[in-house]
């Protein structure tokens, strides 16, 4: 039986805890905090030898006092999550003397780990390691992280998220000499990263994760993206099961994402780049897809999506070079279906008009799926070059008589039924 005592909001810990059996403690307090709760937190933390679980979300000043009380040994602690309310510029650090040899779950969304990640040397059973909002003052190089990961054989989930783009481009040369024999992380299944591509490349070059199935990456914007090590990692992911068969590029207000979602297997890949202007987003997506062209070559269903029903007003004035769209679409040589959101129809119709005569462009494409057929010229051209493409309405659209659709023949009903049951459509 898992018998323990819960120290939570609203419980009179100070007056009752000393009169209860010495069972393990679960300490869980979430803002807002009363004066009684605050005293209860401090009282419980002083009993560090009995604490099994700590989950605190507090104001910065109160969290600072808790960290002072945590500057010691927690022999029973298995779960630790520390975050604070409000001020994102406050820097709080886990004390150097804090040790938790039985820790299995470490989640620090706001509190920084000790310098050089010394905490990890004493937490061998760790299964989940989440370090978020890492500031410049808490920066650690990939080789330091990997050296600590070497001693975590049970690790299944790793999340490293920087709050700013570090290192700066002028200092990225420091990462180029960090290529070493990869450290095996035999149980790692999920990797999340937020930062710059040079750090990501250095990190994935130093690990070997044969069981990785989920990869979630967010990169800060930069001029050039080179991702050979990431490409290799995705190849390893696909070697353990079916390859990715569907992909989506999603243009949002402040980021663009390239996603290959779960389909018949547990594999999941998502890469986002933080940028605002549409031309930047298209260029970033084109570079990402180009860098991962080998991994995208097996995709059969490709979708272009945008966060608004129509092209946002602030994006309508800029002229997008059609060749940029061409570079984005070019890696999808195996795609049979191209689904286009209504907000992107005019942009894509212009781009396909330019590139329609290239027989090497989307050579296996069979269907364009969209709410309106603006692709007559492209469809006619593909017939002339011997690579016919059909137009089809998306699932759920009313079947309105349309001469263009009849002329080029819509997708068979069996394809429409399959599209209606498709599970790969992504979240907005």
Locate each region found by the language model.
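Leucine-rich repeat
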Residues: 1-428
């Amino acid at each position: 039986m898992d018998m323990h005592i819960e120290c939570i909001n609203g419980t009179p810990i100070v007056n009752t805890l000393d009169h209860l059996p010495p069972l393990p403690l679960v300490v869980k307090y979430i803002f807002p905090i009363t004066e009684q709760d605050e005293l209860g937190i401090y009282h419980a933390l002083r009993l560090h030898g009995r604490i099994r679980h700590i989950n605190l979300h507090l104001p910065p000043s109160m969290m600072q006092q808790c960290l002072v009380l945590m500057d010691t040994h927690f022999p029973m602690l298995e779960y630790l999550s520390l975050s604070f309310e409000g001020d994102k510029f406050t820097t709080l650090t886990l004390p150097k003397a804090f040790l938790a040899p039985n820790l299995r779950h470490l989640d620090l969304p706001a509190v920084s780990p000790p310098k050089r990640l010394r905490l990890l040397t004493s937490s061998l059973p760790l299964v989940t390691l989440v370090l978020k909002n890492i500031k410049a003052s808490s920066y650690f190089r990939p080789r330091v992280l990997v050296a600590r990961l070497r001693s975590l054989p049970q690790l299944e989930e790793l999340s490293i998220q920087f709050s700013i783009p570090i290192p700066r481009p002028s200092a990225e040369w420091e990462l180029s000499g960090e290529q070493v024999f990869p450290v095996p992380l035999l149980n790692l299944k999920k990797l999340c990263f937020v930062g710059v591509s040079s750090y990501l490349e250095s990190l994935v070059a130093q690990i070997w994760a044969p069981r990785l199935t989920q990869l979630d990456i967010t990169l800060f914007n930069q001029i050039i993206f080179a991702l050979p090590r990431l490409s290799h990692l995705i190849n390893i992911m696909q070697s353990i099961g079916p390859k990715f068969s569907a992909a989506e590029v999603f243009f949002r207000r402040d980021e663009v994402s390239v996603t290959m979602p779960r389909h018949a297997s547990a594999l999941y890949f998502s890469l986002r780049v933080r940028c605002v202007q549409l031309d930047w987003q298209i260029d970033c997506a084109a570079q990402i897809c180009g860098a991962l062209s080998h991994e995208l070559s097996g995709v059969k269903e490709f979708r272009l999506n945008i966060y608004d029903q129509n092209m946002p007003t602030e994006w309508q004035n800029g002229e997008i070079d059609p060749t940029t769209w061409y570079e984005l679409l070019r890696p999808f040589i195996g795609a049979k279906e191209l689904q286009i959101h209504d907000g992107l129809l005019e942009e894509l119709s212009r781009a396909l008009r330019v590139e329609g005569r290239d027989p090497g462009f989307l050579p296996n494409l069979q269907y364009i799926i969209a709410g309106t057929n603006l692709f007559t010229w492209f469809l006619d051209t593909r017939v002339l070059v011997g690579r016919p493409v059909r137009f089809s309405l998306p699932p759920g659209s009313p079947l309105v008589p349309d001469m263009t659709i009849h002329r080029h023949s819509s997708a068979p009903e069996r394809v429409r039924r399959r599209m209606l049951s498709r599970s790969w459509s992504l979240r907005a």
